[in-house]
Amino acid sequence: MDFDLPPANDPRRLAVKQWLAGHPQPTATQLVDAGYVVPHWPEPWGLNADPLHQIIIDDELAKAGVSRPANQIGIGWAGPTLLTAGTEEQKQRYLRPLLTGREIWCQMFSEPDAGSDLANVATRAVRDGDEYVVNGSKIWTSGGHLSQFGILIARTNPEVPKHEGISYFICPTDLPGLTMTPIVDSTGSHLFNQVFFDDVRLPASLRVGVEGEGWRLAKVTLANERVRLSSAGSLWGNGPSAEDLLDAVRDSGGCSDPIMRQELAALKCEAEVLRLNRLRTLTAQLAGRTPGPEASVQKAMSDDHGQRV
């Protein structure tokens, strides 16, 4: 396993540096136009970059203090699924606003009586001409109240084996009959929501893939949730890293509290573990292997680490 990234004079690294010199504070639109939001996506949204090229871009953006648009579910989950099974019209309509962060997305998978057991979803979508009539409820919808669209799975055929009767949809959050109820936690914070569908009419043109393909596409979505090549030590690829935190402590004169110093040292060690594990995943991909448990370890560890940072 090679833990060394290409040197400073690597042409790919120099190209990013040159672009950043001309765009020292790039807007989201400029980042999208350059292909730097999702370098591994195909053109015109990305650069068809291999994993190594993507990490080079990640490193150079991080060094320059540049953050990508914050739209985790849209960019990380909905986008790859649309690339996999969306129509050309769906890709042209939704991918660019999703990448710039102009349109925020949420996930509508879990249900009150099924939890994360997606095969047992009970929300129904009944075909009626050019529309589906949706009834049911979703829960733990993160950021739904801030989103313009959701990725929705619903049961379109209850007569077939449960894995075969689910379909996948793009769901605008402003449709008549769709309501969001806040779930307020013990601190008074509102991140999650319960979504209710009461005869919501969803155009059939918003179905992704063919009817009954929702189980397969949900697995595509969840696979992209688990494999993330975001910078080690940051939360969802955004916000400060452990190195940023240590730099801030140094710039402020250091830390004399021994307990806090131990915590900072632990964060630094964790960040290095995440960096090396990220490169292990990269090595597997470059060798043509499917990422294994290390991808799940990365997800579980990085979110907790990012919150602590």
Predicted regions and their residues:
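A structural signal for short hydrophobic beta-strand segments in well-ordered beta-sheet cores
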Residues: T123-V126
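C-terminal helix-coil-helix/basic helical segment that borders enzyme active sites and/or dimer interfaces
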Residues: P258-R261, E272-V309
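A short core secondary-structure module
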Residues: D130-E131, N135-T181
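N-terminal glycine-rich flavin-associated loop
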Residues: A70-E89, G115
